[in-house]
Regions:
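Charged, terminal alpha-helix-loop-beta segments
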Residues: 1-143
Length: 143
C-alpha cells in the first residue's frame, strides 16, 4: 500500500525509521524501547525520488530531515485506533529525536471507519485510502 501511495505523491520515502530506544544517544534511557515509523516522506526537492529503507540510507535521511518537511506515515490494512495512536505518539517522539516537528501526519489504509476518520480529521491526520493490491516491492521508482 505504501508503494501505491508513493505513486500518488512521489518524493523520498524512508521506511522503518527508528524513534526512541537505547541506541547510545542521550535522549532515551536504556529502559526505552526502539520503535519504528512505517515511513517518513520528504518532498524530495534534492536527490533521487524513491522508497528507501532507513537502515541502508540513514545519512540521506539525516540530511533530508534537516532541510525538508517531514511527513509521518503509518500504513495499515484498515484504519484503527492503534494506527492513530502510533502516529500521535510518533509525532512527539520524532520531534524530540530529530528536533523538527512533522509537517503532515498520514495514515494510509485500504479500508475506513467513519468514526475513526472523524477523529483523524479533528487531529489533523490525513487518511488516504489506496487499493490493497500488492505493488512491486521496490526500493527505487520504476524507470
Amino acid at each position: 500500500m505504501l508503494f501505491q501511495y508513493w505513486q500518488q505523491i512521489s518524493g523520498r520515502v524512508y521506511t522503518e525509521v527508528p524513534i526512541a530506544g537505547p541506541r547510545g544517544d542521550t535522549l532515551w534511557s536504556a529502559a526505552s524501547t526502539t520503535r519504528r515509523l512505517d515511513a517518513v516522506r520528504f518532498p524530495g526537492r534534492y536527490g533521487e525520488h524513491g522508497i528507501f529503507p532507513f537502515s541502508r540510507n540513514a545519512p540521506g535521511f539525516m540530511s533530508d530531515v534537516q532541510t525538508e518537511l517531514a511527513w509521518l506515515i503509518e500504513v495499515k490494512p484498515k484504519i484503527n485506533r492503534t494506527a492513530i495512536g502510533q502516529v500521535i505518539a510518533g509525532t512527539d517522539l520524532f520531534q524530540k529525536q530529530y528536533s523538527v516537528a512533522p509537517a503532515k501526519l498520514v495514515i494510509v489504509c485500504a479500508g475506513g471507519d467513519a468514526a475513526l476518520e472523524w477523529v483523524c480529521e479533528r487531529r489533523f491526520i490525513d487518511v488516504v485510502k489506496v487499493d490493497p493490491q500488492p505493488g512491486p516491492r521496490r526500493e527505487e521508482p520504476p524507470n
